[in-house]
């Protein structure tokens, strides 16, 4: 509940003076006049000292501690005395954090390690205003450093006149101690709601990524003054912080960030270096022995285990300062953010919290019986609210009708402002609603207002990092029948944290189309349905038993996934999964999948892989550990007919040497590769593709290609490749990784590896296809492609025309490119269209005509409905559409227009 608790007896000041610390203690002396006196935890350090801090370099009239007199007695009646236990958690066994005691009720959001967690929402609210430290949410990027009070130092350097290396005793006893109540909030609080709309790059925070404590430490301002911080005129413009943990970001770094000097020196902001939380030394997860506290800001600015404070001219150049805690525009995805350097634009950095509120009562799945007793009384809805920058929450409203009308809530604000009028803590709200009114409601929503009249938006605003989500918090109200003869109202929160199931957004996601679920917002197919795998563990031998289409398991980064249900839906066809079923394919999965695809994988996680010893690694499992007897045979790939087949095992990489390279244009190359044996054929069925594999800059890179050579060519195969060079396209300044690598290969001395066959489509001849394992016949083919997407079409065209006159399939090709110079295989296509006018018709579409004097007679612009109606047949039972091109072309130019032409997009449309 969020109601104030019964007052408890005060913990009166001891009669004797504080004693010096005993050897081996943490160095914190006790004090009696703590502002949280009576709150149920021990009092703290000796009273704040008055007077100057040291030789001061600027006026400091506001240094005294009088501002806290207003709230010293305020919190005792709001603290629950129940102890939240901490113990060694079995989930930490085998990790670098196995030495840390933690509260077992914390909900883990990122697996076993590192710890990222939030408390159960009901348990958090049960404790009211002050959150017990063991229950406080945790955001860790890596293993927790082992801090030692006696040896820990904080270096203060940079643009200061007196650089110093301060010990913990000096911080605790050499500066006036400030005690600040502050609510900490992760910028990702409520992120799972965003992940239900479109997967962000972040994990699933629920609505309990928020906690409140009373923090004690030295004021940052005092420390900087002691060290002689230079003025703005001396170019001292920023204060940078660096922690102690070793993290992988940026190739290896500490966690670091910065704030402006103006903020750091502002006494009204109460910025401190805390070494105590709720009257006790910091817990390891919260930064022991010392951290940074910036009230009113996101938690990501408050560096834990702080080691260095550097006064600089420029803001921090730390990897995590730029690649974390940003709100980028909704159209920016991970690829665009990296390609166009959105991370470094200062306008998108997050500092202060925004206004937010959450309904905590009723809880998720709580049932309110509807009977003669309950309908005669009101039901109390409760929750919390907060804002940033020291702004007070002044209003909270609840609506039962989607915002048509609002009810004003009663506010419970235990906090008193500091002497500058700033509020750093959450508040609680409640409103009584007649049960009969709830019975007629579909949902309940809440919004809060702060003193600047900022409020929350109605609709969710998606962003790549999933941060600062503060749309109206809505719970659904549904009628249920919990017992015979009785009805009730069941309340449904939008999500449940981490991988927990439940929530109306997750349910809605299964029921609605992407457009209905997120109007006006591009929805990604990578959005994961939350898995419920828990911590079930499997050995590699168990995984190897699941290598068939009946049961296809894979291992990626130590997680085990059952992809059987996804075989029919995989964009690359079932073969793309079956080729690695029953094995660890971490390296290959990372080599070919985007971040969105990696997020989708979470849907199918069933547990964790048990590793035994240090000899296990993914390479061994991928290439040597699995038996093909568990792999469903891929059609034609394992059949030996006439010449031996190079692609005899879809799991094995086949080394192929480059024997010829032709430069067809400034960016188009025809590569010819020799098979391992001169009497082999590649063994690739028409419609399938191969993976080209290469190690580039120490990492495996894999890309799909369709050979343009005849399927029965002996001893070699050819790849037609458009090379995407560096610095040619502003959105992709680095160019194509694989195509530039292929361009660098030397004839005669360079090799690549290939794997296959892969793909969900196979043309078996004379109008017959096998699509996702099912037979399909077509008399007419509508082929629409762009750029290098011509290669799978070319393969089918080649097969049809080689089987003349028996194969009577009609092919209608619409081929789009940027200019006439970019059309691949044009000579062959034009020749075939002339030689076989009843079988093949070709129409070109280009963005721009480079040589109008040549008399371009085809279309200019985009692929439109009019072009398709004029040059491909209308949909029907005997017509099949084949498409291959950039995703926007498929989504906006091809699919909607074919649908208008009566194509059955579920059964008569294939995208390679």
From Swiss-Prot:
Record's subunit section: Homodimer.
BP GO terms, sorted: nitrate assimilation; nitric oxide biosynthetic process; sulfur compound metabolic process
Stretches for region Disordered: 1-99
EC nos: 1.7.1.1
Name this polypeptide is given: Nitrate reductase [NADH]
Low complexity composition bias: residue spans: 13-23
Binding site for FAD: 703-706, 720-725, 732, 737-739, 788, 791
Keywords: Disulfide bond, FAD, Flavoprotein, Heme, Iron, Metal-binding, Molybdenum, NAD, Nitrate assimilation, Oxidoreductase
Enzyme class, UniProt record, top EC level: oxidoreductase
SUPFAM superfamilies xrefs: Cytochrome b5-like heme/steroid binding domain (SSF55856), E set domains (SSF81296), Ferredoxin reductase-like, C-terminal NADP-linked domain (SSF52343), Oxidoreductase molybdopterin-binding domain (SSF56524), Riboflavin synthase domain-like (SSF63380)
Substrates-to-products reaction catalysed: nitrite + NAD(+) + H2O = nitrate + NADH + H(+)
Keyword Heme: yes
Domain FAD-binding FR-type positions: 651-764
Domain Cytochrome b5 heme-binding: 535-610
Cofactor note (record): Binds 1 FAD per subunit.
Chain residues that bind Mo-molybdopterin: 186
Taxonomic lineage of the native organism: Eukaryota, Viridiplantae, Streptophyta, Embryophyta, Tracheophyta
CDD domains according to UniProt: cyt_b5_reduct_like, eukary_NR_Moco
Composition-biased stretches (Basic and acidic residues): 85-94
